[in-house]
């Protein structure tokens, strides 16, 4: 080939590169996310669904969620009612369009089926018609997924799935033929595309993301989320497959290794309120980066302290007040005598074993006050309240507070326990006086400002403000656990590095 021919080939290559979309040239696949503001209808639906979820979980027992070591326990708690960010995919050939949540906290892809005849929810959403796809392959294996505020059931099928410019071939997914209840009927999305690990996939189905990597569709085994928190609605952000967009973040990412496959789970350090330690996670907690959870969920003991500092409404726990009035001084004396904190509640006779467990059952009893809820000290509300009091008192003693001040403060916290329905209101005019809440990840503090963790609903005189924090107690061995949902991921650009098994955070641009 002559010099002239080589030059022409090079020129053609340059021109072709210039004509390619920027994302293709970068080896990135971009999915635009739409943002929907939280409205009053969604809030009402969330509360109703939350009540149903609490009743269902109460029958199983709060402690059973983590005790069995099952990988699907967090999925069983998920609440999609206040989801705000959605993207579009196609299923079949030609592609049938569906709006989905890209959810790093679950691993299956499901969409409503045209064979869904008896669930009203299906008729409010797009439905997959296998007969209209030339690449459909029958599977038929039954499937069901139970979420915290809803469930779906159906069967597996296989077809091509279009994500942006990519076509994932032979993808196993669930055709949902049953979507009972309120949750998915009022949802603004059709289905869910899970981006978690295969370990938590129902039916052991290979997740869409795995297939992208296996079929060589992405340049790097990495995907990243950017949520546009500056937009009330419309352009909500972007998910990038194959890497990250430098215009979406500032500075460098702080990476932490995935500590347990299944979820994008990692180890997290102390949580600080206004720069002061809460003590609860000083020796370490686990956390999950979860794009399918709108709020930021954590242990009741810390959420209660946050509620108190931001002036959030709460519920009064008589069990908590009883512990303070009848056992508070004794607990303080044992802490001052350097008794091992995990043994204190059993020593005062409120727990039947040494070691922490979840407190969800206790908080539920505050509202429901159902007979029999507190039977058995091991999982009773008095034991739960005692364990929280020990954590709170430890933290106050570390700040050299007097015993009277400590007991008064703990009594105040008993009035600020989070609602079991997960929503706490705050005064919109008080944001300037609210503290920063910081999370220690990879040795670095990631702070959330009030305007980042308070969600505004409505406009003008009708506007209401709700806390972006909600209580969720996961006992050992899975917990204590934080779920860093969209409230956190909106402030921090998040990278999910499948190749190096790590999660990275940097300030969003």
From Swiss-Prot:
Q: Using the UniProt record, give the first listed, main subcellular location.
A: other
**Which residues act catalytically here?**
103, 290
**Which keywords label this protein?**
Aspartyl protease, Disulfide bond, Glycoprotein, Hydrolase, Protease, Signal, Vacuole, Zymogen
Keyword match Magnesium:
no
Q: Which SUPFAM superfamilies match?
A: Acid proteases, Saposin
Q: Biological process GO annotation list?
A: lipid metabolic process; proteolysis
Q: Which InterPro entries match?
A: Aspartic_peptidase_A1 (IPR001461), Aspartic_peptidase_AS (IPR001969), PEPTIDASE_A1 (IPR033121), Peptidase_aspartic_dom_sf (IPR021109), Phytepsin (IPR033869), SapB_1 (IPR007856), SapB_2 (IPR008138), Saposin-like (IPR011001)
Q: Which PROSITE patterns does the entry link to?
A: ASP_PROTEASE, PEPTIDASE_A1, SAP_B
Q: Which GO cellular component terms, listed alphabetically, does the Swiss-Prot or TrEMBL entry include?
A: vacuole
Q: Name one Pfam family in it.
A: SapB_1
One GO MF term on file is: aspartic-type endopeptidase activity
EC number(s) given by UniProt: 3.4.23.-
The pro-peptide lies at: 25-67
Top-level taxon of origin: Eukaryota
Broadest EC class assigned to this enzyme: hydrolase
The residue ranges of the Saposin B-type domain are: 315-420
Family, as annotated: Belongs to the peptidase A1 family.
Function as written in the Swiss-Prot or TrEMBL entry: Involved in the breakdown of propeptides of storage proteins in protein-storage vacuoles.
Query: What's the name of the protein?
Result: Aspartic proteinase oryzasin-1
